[in-house]
Amino acid sequence: MSEEGFVLIGDSSDGHFPATSFHVYTLARKRFYCLDLGGLTESRGSSAGQKVYPTVADLPTEHSDLALIWVSKGAARRAVEAAHEAGCRRVWFSFLTTEPGAVERARELGLEIVELGRCPVAYLGREQVPTGCRIHMGSMKLTGTWQRPPQTDANVRRRELV
């Protein structure tokens, strides 16, 4: 496994292809590999037409051990299974993706939970994110969630910012 090249997991079959994240990571020149549980082979949105992997078997082996999960709560367990199958050892559940059963399954599989509920795009730096993400970052700063330690307990009562 490489130190670079995280796996970005989306699911176009339920409307959760991470087009904004895909575009932002592309603009920031981050190395990543997008796995779509819905079977897309090309990206959508502002970076349309770029390579997307429709199955774990299609992913290059040189990705890092981190998977960013950007799916509906109903597909979160399937995304965890895919991350594990891909050889990832760490998972980050983006906002509105945290489902307690998926978090429990990740732990059963020995995966480290990096974060539950915060969008990783916000941590790229202000100059690299679109206006909508900047507004989201501002709301995180206003509510104090920006500086909080990583959230890894799926059962804690909290609000996820959208």
What residue spans do the PLM features occupy?
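Glycine-rich, highly charged phosphate/nucleotide-binding loops
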Residues: 45-78
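ADP-ribose/adenylate-binding Rossmann-like module
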Residues: 83-106
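NAD(P)-binding Rossmann-fold cofactor-contacting core
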Residues: 16-17, 22-46
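A short helix->loop->beta-strand "cap" motif at the edges of active sites that frequently abuts
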Residues: 4, 29-30, 86-90, 109-111
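A charged, well-structured terminal subsegment
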Residues: 123-162
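Glycine-rich adenosine-cofactor-binding loop
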Residues: 3-20
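Short acidic, glycine/proline-enriched helix-loop-strand junctions
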Residues: 61-63, 99-124
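Short catalytic-loop micro-motif centered on adjacent basic/acidic residues
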Residues: 8, 67-69, 89-93
